A protein has these predicted regions:
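C-terminal helical cap/extension that packs against the catalytic core
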Residues: 3, 34-35, 67-123
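Active-site catalytic pocket residues across diverse enzymes, especially alpha/beta-hydrolases
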Residues: 53, 115, 138-142
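Nucleotide phosphate-binding/pyrophosphate-handling subdomain across enzymes
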Residues: 1-81
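Short, active-site-adjacent cap segments at secondary-structure transitions
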Residues: 130-132
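Active-site-proximal loop/hinge segments that shape catalytic or ion-binding/gating pockets
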Residues: 127
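Flexible, gly/pro- and Lys/Arg-enriched active-site loops
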Residues: 7, 16, 20-23, 74, ...
Length: 147
């Protein structure tokens, strides 16, 4: 379709390469640690997301209407550590597991400690609401947005 509009191949390639979708494999640097935000909230998305990493520290939050067990089945095998957090109003709480944090930012801060020790990134996922809550603070100047 873009070719039909007369766009040059180089412009199409550059656009695809530089495209960004907030909350989808979005990368930040926070206190020297790479933090990835991704709203993966179903098993196929979680499977695709997990393939992008060899290991990570996981911050996870979800809503009861989602296939949480299916999502975690793909994410947990590569998680060096896990922190569960409330994704938003009506989201799952402590029943997700422990350690559980009401405030996702506190879960992220806690995950940073482990990440600084081993150099692995932090991956926050499971809900676009969780990602949105974290992203709001990161783009407010607390973290550096990376390409």
């Amino acid at each position: 379709a873009l070719r039909l509009l007369g766009l040059p191949e180089a412009a199409i390639a550059r656009g695809l390469r530089e495209a960004r979708h907030p909350g989808r494999m979005e990368r930040f640097l926070l206190k020297g640690v790479e933090v990835y935000l991704d709203g993966a909230h179903n098993p196929p998305a979680a499977e695709a997301l997990a393939r992008e990493f060899s290991a990570y520290h996981l911050v996870f939050g979800a809503f009861p209407r989602k296939d949480v067990k299916g999502v975690l089945a793909h994410l947990l095998p590569k998680a060096r550590s896990v922190r569960y957090a409330r994704a938003g109003e009506g989201a799952l709480g402590g029943e997700l597991g422990t350690p559980f944090f009401e405030d996702p930012w506190e879960a992220l801060e806690d995950a940073l400690a482990g990440a600084r020790e081993d150099g692995l990134p932090v991956l926050a996922t499971g809900s676009l609401y969780l990602v949105g809550r974290l992203r709001e603070r990161l783009v407010a100047g607390l973290g550096e947005d990376l390409p």
